[in-house]
Amino acid sequence: MAGKHKSNGVSPVSTSSPIDPFLADQGLLLLDGGLATELENKGYVLDTPLWSAHLLSTRPEAIREVHRAYLEAGANCIIAASYQASIPGFLAGGWTEDEATSLLRSAVILAQEAREAYLDSRPLPLRPLVAASIGPYGA
């Protein structure tokens, strides 16, 4: 049966994606430039195993400020401060499980808050995206 495609009976999956409007409008999706690097450029020391996720507890406003700066620079997608974040990582740092769960959620919430504040000051035809960052677990 050379040249014939054998169907497995599964319907094709929709390929619609949140990035499609950006690709259609501008041909690309511009991500932020690296949250931890910019936090370090601002003088924050990220020498804990949680890296920038440590600031979720100690300096959430710094994370929100950097997200906003990336949006102002033209980013279409900002990436949450969750790269090194994990429940075991927060537990090892002295937080309770409830606190750890709340901190993980706050990584995305801070990015969403930065996006909403940015959009309040400058309505855009395309709403910037917020993405979680998942690093190597337990690195």
Which residues make up each language-model segment?
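Domain-level signal for soluble alpha/beta catalytic cores
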Residues: 2-139
